[in-house]
A protein has these predicted regions:
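Extracytoplasmic "Venus flytrap"
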Residues: 74-98, 104, 113-124, 217-221, ...
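Bacterial lipoprotein signal-peptidase II cleavage site
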Residues: 50-69
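Beta-alpha junction/loop-to-helix N-cap segments that form part of ligand/metal-binding clefts
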Residues: 113-175, 266-284, 288-293
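Flexible loop/turn connectors
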Residues: 296-348
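Hydrophobic alpha-helical segments within soluble ligand-binding/sensing domains
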Residues: 73, 167-209, 308-329
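An alpha-beta-alpha
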Residues: 79-81, 97, 185-232, 330-350
Length: 366
């Protein structure tokens, strides 16, 4: 997948315009004329040298360099942030992103336009199209639907995703090898799925049937449960998928899973993350433990998780953004970045279910 942007006028073009204006000056004295011609020649040679040095850089790097020059002259970078929905994980990623950009560029040199799509894909599209119309310098797409909308809205403005699980799946890239190319890069919240399956075995070696609860409208959730299901079956478990279309049927589907299964696994899923109270209200009274794909879900309804820090994920994304805006990096050449994982458990829910965390787990704070 390659995305190209139109280049800016070359340095030679600019020098030619300078030369034209100098030649238009009516200089009568021969000595002054020679000085003027010498000046023209010097400017042209310098411009040609600069063009030769920068000829291999892509148009995205050139655009980023010009944005950096503008900010140095007192113009703020305009950064649009499209966040799919409000919940702890995405909120932390946005904060980490903003903090990193302020640290890297100076708070006075960056202006954020934050928009919450309220978990609506149509709103994601509207937000990103507005960013393009407003001429922002960079777009942060927080969560998969936000990234998909940003990719559809522009092939020119640099787009960074965060809280995106699998970029190949999200963008329909059959040949994805770690770098998207074009105007898109970012960070992934994909945890090691084989280790998540192994964590279920670590906590519940005697369980027989594992329910995989997820939103069918989120392709990254489908990807996760497919992989985890295969890993669980390798470990000898019966693994069954329970999909809900949206928050309206989550309660009924979760009730079915809790009635049928010994343990429930919930992947990194935006709809589940926004509705952990529903899941906890069903599973905890039923005595069915939940293993979660990320810390925000585990904090709301889970026993344990193989967790990443979404704040750190967002901060890494912000550091990438600073490099793009200042011309230090070309977004088309930046690979997707990942973060480290930590084993964590929910002390309150473990106490309620009479569970003791295995060695090596850290209690979730708050």
């Amino acid at each position: 997948m390659k995305r190209e942007r139109a280049g800016k006028a070359s340095a030679v073009d600019r020098s030619n315009r300078i030369g034209g204006s100098l030649e238009g000056i009516g200089i009568r004295e021969e000595t002054n004329m020679k000085k003027a011609l010498s000046m023209i020649l010097a400017v042209s040679l310098c411009a040609a040298a600069l063009t030769g040095c920068g000829g291999s850089a892509s148009s995205s790097a050139a655009a980023s360099s010009e944005a950096g020059s503008a900010a140095a002259a007192g113009t703020k970078y305009k950064v649009g942030i499209c966040q799919l929905v409000e919940h702890d994980a995405l909120d932390a990623a946005t904060k980490g992103f903003e903090d990193a950009l302020k640290e890297q560029l100076g708070e006075e040199n960056v202006e954020f336009d934050f928009q919450n799509a309220q978990n609506d894909t149509t709103t994601c599209a509207t937000i990103n199209n507005t960013f393009v119309s407003n001429g922002v310098d960079l777009i942060l797409a927080n969560a998969t639907p936000a990234l998909q909308a940003a990719a559809a809205a522009t092939t020119e403005i640099p787009v960074l995703g965060t809280s995106v699980t699998e970029y190949g799946v999200a963008l329909g890239l059959d040949d994805f090898n770690g770098t998207v190319g074009g105007n898109i890069s970012g960070t992934s919240d994909l945890p090691p799925l084989d280790q998540q399956a192994a964590m279920i075995q670590e906590w519940f070696p005697d369980a027989k049937k594992i329910g995989l609860l997820y939103c069918s409208a989120e392709p990254n959730s489908q990807y996760q449960v497919d992989v985890v299901q295969a890993e669980l079956e390798k470990l000898g478990y019966e693994a069954v998928q329970y999909s809900f279309a949206d928050s309206n049927d989550l309660s009924s589907v979760c009730s079915s899973a809790a009635a049928d299964c010994d343990v429930i696994y919930v992947p990194t899923d935006n709809t589940a993350a926004a509705n952990t109270g529903i899941i906890d209200g069903i599973c905890r009274p039923a005595g069915v433990p939940v293993i979660a794909g990320e810390e925000g879900i585990a904090k709301g309804c889970g026993v344990a998780t193989l967790s990443i820090s979404y704040y750190d994920l967002g901060k890494t994304t912000g550091e990438m953004a600073a490099k793009i805006l200042t011309g230090e990096a070309d977004v088309s050449e930046m690979p997707i970045e990942y973060t480290t994982v930590t084993k964590k458990y929910n002390a309150e829910i473990c106490d309620a279910l009479g569970l003791t965390a295995p060695e090596g787990y850290v209690a979730i704070e708050g």
